[in-house]
Swiss-Prot record:
Catalyzes the cyclization of GTP to (8S)-3',8-cyclo-7,8-dihydroguanosine 5'-triphosphate. Its cofactor is [4Fe-4S] cluster. This is GTP 3',8-cyclase. It catalyses: GTP + AH2 + S-adenosyl-L-methionine = (8S)-3',8-cyclo-7,8-dihydroguanosine 5'-triphosphate + 5'-deoxyadenosine + L-methionine + A + H(+). It comes from Rhodopseudomonas palustris (strain TIE-1).
Length: 344
């Protein structure tokens, strides 16, 4: 894959703004729906993935990302599925890194389960990636196997060590699960902070059928925070990324702890992001079914005029907030698509 064939981004006249005055400068792109784990809160064990022919090519993903950068996106995150299982994905990372060199892009980053990180960490750093988010819900090998079904904890920990050795900043993302890892949060926090890594806790989200009810997995993070406050001093931080996390400093560890609470605390008022699936569908809200097709305008012309207009139309339809709810009366997915398709 070469960047020479890709149309370079033009100068940004003005940033993209949605109907509620929010600047859209963060793009999350799922480059594959495939994953080498089958986490119990994410997908069913017998998950059927998209035919490979349905996915955008790496060149198309590059052109799509570049079109958003030309329209004011400053932060780009590659997700999945597990992005590092897509063949030749590093050629996409290397090509997109040209936008870092020109200053058109502030940050190129990745969310991963860590299983392939030992193999790719050094190359990611060489491409200008400065930090990665690693999804890790437990440090107990048996519980890790139960949650991921197919995962190997030692391999993930080796990936985290390789990332740190390569100079990548690592943040741990943990989904809190009732009766599973909820009592392990303090030790997970001490471990992460002890290695200089941030930890962000995430409530279960009602996305896609998983073969069981999410109400049996759901723990409100307000409860977890109250438990932590009994033994730790949590000081609210003003840090804002335009995203869903609210941060505290844990005085006893010196580390930062984030809470993503779509169900107990709506996080939509400052949303600055949109998501693109590996098939070229744009979702302007994680918690809505509404979507727009960007693959057709992408393939309809060699220049980006049609694509740019389609992006503008999609941003113009971004809703004010999500519709997530979990309770006994609403124990079905609020959104039918899985996070592995949308991009986690």
């Amino acid at each position: 894959m070469t960047s020479a064939a890709i149309t370079p981004p033009t100068t940004v006249d003005r940033p993209m703004t949605d109907p509620f005055g929010r600047t859209i400068d963060y793009l999350r792109v799922s480059i594959t729906d495939r994953c080498d784990f089958r986490c119990v809160y994410c997908m069913a064990e017998d998950m059927t993935f998209l035919p490979r022919a349905d996915l955008l090519t790496l060149e198309e993903l590059d052109r799509l990302c570049s079109a958003f950068i030309a329209k004011g996106v400053r932060k780009l995150r590659l997700t999945g599925g597990e992005p590092l299982v897509r063949r030749n994905m590093m050629s996409l990372v290397r090509s997109l890194s040209r936008h870092l060199k020109t200053g058109a892009l502030d940050e190129l980053t990745l969310t991963t389960n860590g299983s392939q990180l030992a193999r790719f960490a050094a190359e990611l750093a060489d491409c200008g990636v400065r930090r990665v988010n690693v999804s890790l819900d437990t440090l107990d090998p048996d519980e890790f196997r139960r949650i991921t079904r197919w995962g190997d904890l030692d391999r993930v920990l080796a990936g985290i060590n390789a990332a740190r050795a390569a100079g990548l900043a690592v943040k741990i993302n943990s989904v809190v699960l009732k009766g599973s890892n909820e009592d392990e949060i303090p030790s997970l926090m001490r471990w992460a902070h002890g290695l200089g890594m941030g930890l962000t806790l995430i409530e279960v989200m009602p996305l896609g059928e998983i073969g069981e009810g999410r109400i049996d997995q759901y723990v409100p993070l307000s409860l977890i925070r109250a438990r932590l406050s009994a033994n730790y001093t949590l000081t609210d931080l003003p840090d804002s990324t335009g995203g869903p996390a609210r941060y505290v400093r844990v005085e006893e560890t010196g580390g930062r702890l984030g809470f993503i609470t779509p169900l107990t605390h709506n996080f939509c008022e400052s949303c600055n992001r949109v998501r693109i699936t590996c098939t070229g569908t744009i979702h302007t809200c994680l918690g809505h079914e509404d979507a727009s097709d960007l693959r057709r305008p992408l393939r309809a012309s060699a220049d980006d005029a049609l694509l740019s207009a389609a992006i503008d139309q999609a941003i113009g339809s971004k809703p004010k907030g999500h519709d997530f709810i979990i309770d006994r009366r609403h124990n079905r997915p609020s959104v039918s698509r899985h996070m592995s398709v949308t991009g986690g």
